[in-house]
Protein backbone atom coordinates (compact mmCIF):
# COMPACT_ATOMS: atom_id res chain seq x y z
CA UNK A 1 0.00 0.00 0.00
CA UNK A 2 1.35 3.43 -0.95
CA UNK A 3 1.07 6.03 1.79
CA UNK A 4 0.69 9.62 0.67
CA UNK A 5 0.93 12.80 2.69
CA UNK A 6 -0.65 16.16 2.00
CA UNK A 7 2.84 17.71 1.99
CA UNK A 8 3.21 18.35 -1.77
CA UNK A 9 2.12 14.74 -2.34
CA UNK A 10 5.37 13.31 -1.01
CA UNK A 11 5.20 9.64 -0.20
CA UNK A 12 5.81 8.53 3.35
CA UNK A 13 9.04 6.90 2.19
CA UNK A 14 10.19 10.21 0.71
CA UNK A 15 9.34 12.03 3.93
CA UNK A 16 11.33 9.52 5.97
CA UNK A 17 14.29 9.88 3.62
CA UNK A 18 14.12 13.66 3.98
CA UNK A 19 14.01 13.25 7.75
CA UNK A 20 17.04 10.96 7.73
CA UNK A 21 19.05 13.41 5.63
CA UNK A 22 18.02 16.29 7.89
CA UNK A 23 19.24 14.42 10.97
CA UNK A 24 22.57 13.60 9.32
CA UNK A 25 23.03 17.22 8.26
CA UNK A 26 22.11 18.50 11.72
CA UNK A 27 24.68 16.25 13.36
CA UNK A 28 27.42 17.37 10.99
CA UNK A 29 26.71 21.12 10.99
CA UNK A 30 28.32 22.26 14.24
CA UNK A 31 25.07 24.07 14.98
CA UNK A 32 24.22 26.61 17.65
CA UNK A 33 20.53 26.78 18.58
CA UNK A 34 19.32 30.38 18.79
CA UNK A 35 16.04 31.97 19.77
CA UNK A 36 13.89 34.21 17.58
CA UNK A 37 16.01 37.22 18.55
CA UNK A 38 19.24 35.52 17.60
CA UNK A 39 20.48 34.88 21.13
CA UNK A 40 22.29 31.62 21.78
CA UNK A 41 20.21 29.03 23.61
CA UNK A 42 22.58 26.07 23.42
CA UNK A 43 25.63 25.01 21.47
CA UNK A 44 25.00 21.63 19.89
CA UNK A 45 28.27 21.32 17.97
CA UNK A 46 29.35 18.58 15.60
CA UNK A 47 28.08 15.28 16.95
CA UNK A 48 30.08 12.06 17.27
CA UNK A 49 27.99 8.88 17.19
CA UNK A 50 28.87 5.91 19.36
CA UNK A 51 27.35 2.43 19.33
CA UNK A 52 25.29 0.89 22.11
CA UNK A 53 28.19 -1.51 22.72
CA UNK A 54 30.63 1.36 23.23
CA UNK A 55 28.06 3.12 25.43
CA UNK A 56 27.87 0.00 27.60
CA UNK A 57 31.66 -0.36 27.73
CA UNK A 58 31.90 3.26 28.92
CA UNK A 59 29.65 2.52 31.87
CA UNK A 60 26.54 3.86 30.14
CA UNK A 61 28.02 7.33 29.78
CA UNK A 62 28.62 9.64 26.84
CA UNK A 63 31.81 11.71 26.73
CA UNK A 64 30.62 15.31 26.45
CA UNK A 65 34.18 16.54 25.78
CA UNK A 66 33.98 14.57 22.52
CA UNK A 67 30.30 15.47 22.04
CA UNK A 68 29.30 11.81 21.93
CA UNK A 69 25.73 10.67 21.37
CA UNK A 70 24.72 7.02 21.53
CA UNK A 71 22.46 5.75 18.75
CA UNK A 72 19.77 3.28 19.79
CA UNK A 73 19.25 1.24 16.65
CA UNK A 74 15.80 -0.07 17.54
CA UNK A 75 14.29 3.43 17.77
CA UNK A 76 16.65 5.73 15.87
CA UNK A 77 16.94 7.96 18.95
CA UNK A 78 20.30 9.59 19.70
CA UNK A 79 21.10 10.46 23.32
CA UNK A 80 23.76 12.42 25.15
CA UNK A 81 23.80 12.38 28.95
CA UNK A 82 24.94 15.82 30.13
CA UNK A 83 24.35 15.12 33.84
CA UNK A 84 23.43 11.83 35.47
CA UNK A 85 21.39 13.60 38.13
CA UNK A 86 21.02 13.18 41.87
CA UNK A 87 19.31 10.42 43.79
CA UNK A 88 18.65 7.05 42.17
CA UNK A 89 17.13 5.50 39.08
CA UNK A 90 13.45 4.70 39.11
CA UNK A 91 13.17 1.19 40.53
CA UNK A 92 11.23 -1.59 38.84
CA UNK A 93 7.61 -1.65 39.93
CA UNK A 94 7.72 1.98 41.03
CA UNK A 95 5.91 5.07 39.76
CA UNK A 96 7.06 8.67 40.16
CA UNK A 97 6.10 12.16 39.11
CA UNK A 98 8.96 13.96 37.39
CA UNK A 99 9.23 17.65 36.56
CA UNK A 100 10.55 18.20 33.05
CA UNK A 101 11.78 21.37 31.38
CA UNK A 102 12.92 21.38 27.78
CA UNK A 103 13.89 23.05 24.54
CA UNK A 104 12.34 21.59 21.39
CA UNK A 105 14.12 22.37 18.11
CA UNK A 106 12.44 21.35 14.85
CA UNK A 107 15.33 19.99 12.79
CA UNK A 108 13.50 20.24 9.46
CA UNK A 109 12.22 23.71 10.31
CA UNK A 110 15.67 24.71 11.60
CA UNK A 111 14.19 26.67 14.50
CA UNK A 112 13.04 26.42 18.10
CA UNK A 113 9.46 25.20 18.05
CA UNK A 114 8.69 25.11 21.77
CA UNK A 115 10.46 25.62 25.07
CA UNK A 116 9.39 25.44 28.69
CA UNK A 117 12.55 26.86 30.26
CA UNK A 118 11.15 30.38 30.00
CA UNK A 119 9.31 32.53 32.54
CA UNK A 120 5.83 31.97 31.18
CA UNK A 121 6.07 28.23 31.89
CA UNK A 122 8.01 28.31 35.17
CA UNK A 123 4.83 28.08 37.30
CA UNK A 124 3.48 25.26 35.09
CA UNK A 125 6.20 22.80 34.16
CA UNK A 126 5.41 19.59 32.35
CA UNK A 127 4.89 16.84 34.93
CA UNK A 128 5.52 13.29 33.77
CA UNK A 129 3.93 10.41 35.64
CA UNK A 130 6.24 7.52 34.81
CA UNK A 131 6.25 3.84 35.76
CA UNK A 132 9.01 1.26 35.49
CA UNK A 133 7.43 -2.04 34.51
CA UNK A 134 10.22 -4.64 34.55
CA UNK A 135 12.58 -2.24 32.80
CA UNK A 136 9.99 -0.97 30.32
CA UNK A 137 8.80 2.58 30.95
CA UNK A 138 5.32 3.96 30.41
CA UNK A 139 4.34 7.56 31.02
CA UNK A 140 1.83 10.31 30.50
CA UNK A 141 1.73 14.04 31.15
CA UNK A 142 -0.03 14.57 34.47
CA UNK A 143 -2.49 17.45 34.16
CA UNK A 144 -4.20 17.04 37.54
CA UNK A 145 -1.71 19.08 39.56
CA UNK A 146 -1.18 22.18 37.41
CA UNK A 147 -3.47 21.75 34.42
CA UNK A 148 -0.63 20.69 32.16
CA UNK A 149 2.53 22.30 30.87
CA UNK A 150 3.85 23.45 27.51
CA UNK A 151 3.64 20.07 25.78
CA UNK A 152 0.04 19.41 26.76
CA UNK A 153 -1.15 22.92 25.93
CA UNK A 154 0.72 23.03 22.61
CA UNK A 155 -0.12 19.57 21.27
CA UNK A 156 -3.29 18.69 23.17
CA UNK A 157 -2.12 15.25 24.20
CA UNK A 158 -1.11 13.63 27.47
CA UNK A 159 1.10 11.16 25.59
CA UNK A 160 4.78 11.54 26.44
CA UNK A 161 6.99 11.14 23.33
CA UNK A 162 8.46 7.65 23.36
CA UNK A 163 11.89 9.13 22.71
CA UNK A 164 11.73 11.01 26.01
CA UNK A 165 11.54 7.71 27.91
CA UNK A 166 14.87 6.41 26.61
CA UNK A 167 17.06 8.22 29.20
CA UNK A 168 15.20 6.83 32.22
CA UNK A 169 17.10 3.54 32.06
CA UNK A 170 20.33 5.45 32.70
CA UNK A 171 19.68 8.65 34.67
CA UNK A 172 18.83 9.42 38.29
CA UNK A 173 15.68 11.35 39.10
CA UNK A 174 16.23 12.77 42.57
CA UNK A 175 15.81 16.35 43.73
CA UNK A 176 18.42 19.10 43.87
CA UNK A 177 18.95 19.68 47.59
CA UNK A 178 22.09 21.83 47.38
CA UNK A 179 23.64 24.27 44.87
CA UNK A 180 26.46 21.80 44.20
CA UNK A 181 24.10 19.12 42.95
CA UNK A 182 22.75 18.99 39.43
CA UNK A 183 19.51 17.38 38.27
CA UNK A 184 19.54 15.01 35.31
CA UNK A 185 20.10 16.66 31.95
CA UNK A 186 20.10 15.02 28.53
CA UNK A 187 20.07 15.90 24.87
CA UNK A 188 18.10 13.84 22.38
CA UNK A 189 17.57 13.63 18.66
CA UNK A 190 14.12 12.10 18.22
CA UNK A 191 12.78 10.89 14.87
CA UNK A 192 9.10 11.37 14.13
CA UNK A 193 8.24 7.78 15.02
CA UNK A 194 9.33 8.40 18.63
CA UNK A 195 8.19 12.03 18.85
CA UNK A 196 5.21 14.11 19.91
CA UNK A 197 1.91 13.85 18.05
CA UNK A 198 2.57 16.70 15.63
CA UNK A 199 6.00 15.38 14.68
CA UNK A 200 4.55 11.92 14.16
CA UNK A 201 1.77 13.23 11.92
CA UNK A 202 3.98 15.53 9.86
CA UNK A 203 7.15 13.41 9.80
CA UNK A 204 9.84 15.65 11.23
CA UNK A 205 12.62 15.06 13.77
CA UNK A 206 13.34 17.18 16.82
CA UNK A 207 16.37 17.95 18.93
CA UNK A 208 15.70 18.28 22.65
CA UNK A 209 17.58 19.47 25.68
CA UNK A 210 15.72 18.24 28.77
CA UNK A 211 16.09 18.27 32.53
CA UNK A 212 14.33 15.86 34.88
CA UNK A 213 13.72 16.25 38.61
CA UNK A 214 11.53 14.17 40.89
CA UNK A 215 8.59 15.98 42.47
CA UNK A 216 8.30 16.14 46.23
CA UNK A 217 6.01 13.50 47.68
For each predicted feature, which ranges?
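Cross-family detector of peptidyl-prolyl cis-trans isomerase
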Residues: 6-217
Amino acid sequence: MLLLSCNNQETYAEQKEKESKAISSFMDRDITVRDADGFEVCKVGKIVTISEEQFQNQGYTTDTTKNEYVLFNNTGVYMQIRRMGTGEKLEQGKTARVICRFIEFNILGDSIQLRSDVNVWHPKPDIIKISNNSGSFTANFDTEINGGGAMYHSYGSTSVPSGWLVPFSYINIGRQDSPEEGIAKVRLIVPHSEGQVNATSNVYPCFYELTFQKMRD
